[in-house]
Every structure is written in C-alpha cells, then in structure tokens.
Amino acid sequence: MIQLERAGIERGEIADLFITHAHTDHVLGAIWLIRMTLQRPAPEVLRIYSHKRVLDMLTAVCEMMLPQKLIQRMPDRIQLIEVHDGDRFEVGDMRLQCYDIHSTKEQQYGFTADLPGGVRLVCLGDEPFNAANASYAEGADWLMSEAFCLYADRERYKPYEKHHSTALDAARDAANLHVRNLILYHTEDDHLAQRKALYTAEAATAFCGSIRVPDDLEVIELD
C-alpha cells in the first residue's frame, strides 16, 4: 500500500486485478485492496481475475480475517472472476488471454494483453518460459520475464532449484521468440544499486532488442 501511495495511485483507480498464482507475495496484497474497497463508499467494485485456487484462497482469508460487516459487502463489491486456460476477456480498452504456464510447483497463469494501438504485452508469470506456450509469446512487442539472478551467479543463488531462470536464460528465450522488448523482474535484491547495469549487460549478450530492468516505482511506457 505504501508503494501505491508513493506511485500516486489511489485505491479507487484500481478496478481490475489479475493474480497469477497463490503464493503469499502475490495474494496477500490483494487482501488489503479488498478491505479498502469494502471500506470505501459504494458503488465502487473491484474485479479480480484468476484460477479457482487463488479465488478460493482469497475468499477463505477474507472470511477469517475481515470484520463481518465487511464480509457482508463482498458479494456486491468484490467480483471474483474465475478464468481457465485459454480464456479471453476484456478489461477497459485491453483484450487479454490467460494461459496455464504448466508449472510443476503451483498452478499458475500467465497472460497476453493486446493494448490500444496494436501493442502486445506478454507476462510469463513467476517461472521460466515453457516452450508449450510459445504461441502466446512469439513476436510479442513486450515480454515480461522473471530473472532471479545473473547466470554468472547461478551457483550462489541456485535459480533452477527454485524454478527460476537467469538474466541470460530470459534473454535467450526473448531472442528465440523474436520479441521487441524484454522486461526482467523478480530478481534477487542483493545488488540493487548495480542490478540494472549488471542484468542489462548479461541479457544483452544474447538479446539485441530493448532490455528493461525496472527499479521500484519506475514507469515504462509500452509503445
């Protein structure tokens, strides 16, 4: 919530939320958004899109933690929208399609977003690219890929044991998929001051497109 405030984003500006999977670092923030929505004047509504496991977890946590007077408002104020592999839906002026990333650790969905002007953004989720999903990512204008660490530091951070990739792995995937721009995120945080330069340099050895390694609160214009 502090970071939303620092970014100048009001709770009321968030009407739609996509949650990839049920890990705590992805789900717990949604509980605060739900609570704030329920506390604000009607008729504000929050729509949350995800698969059944995530939605069931959100419902259970809210029922255990929120005051009864807020829980009673949920049916009218919180729309939990279950999506399935390959489903298409629209959010504002964006057309989205979600897909199962075929995680062996936790059910997880990525998504594609067709933006105004013909720009296509693809989010791979929280794990490495799976070749089974090549059709979703091929030729994307923007590819969002996790990169847990540098390939040079793989022995220290053990990314493959954690179902994660390196900056070099993500760059190779981006090159093979012929995307225009690569966004690297979900990194270790031991090198924050040098992260942008280090990750960009390693990725550039395998990918010749634009590479972004955003710092917290950095804004990227998708064009």
Describe every region a protein language model picked out.
Residues 128-218:
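Cap/insert and terminal regions of metallo-dependent hydrolase folds
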Residues 1-123, 128, 133-135, 197-223:
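Binuclear metal-dependent hydrolase catalytic cores
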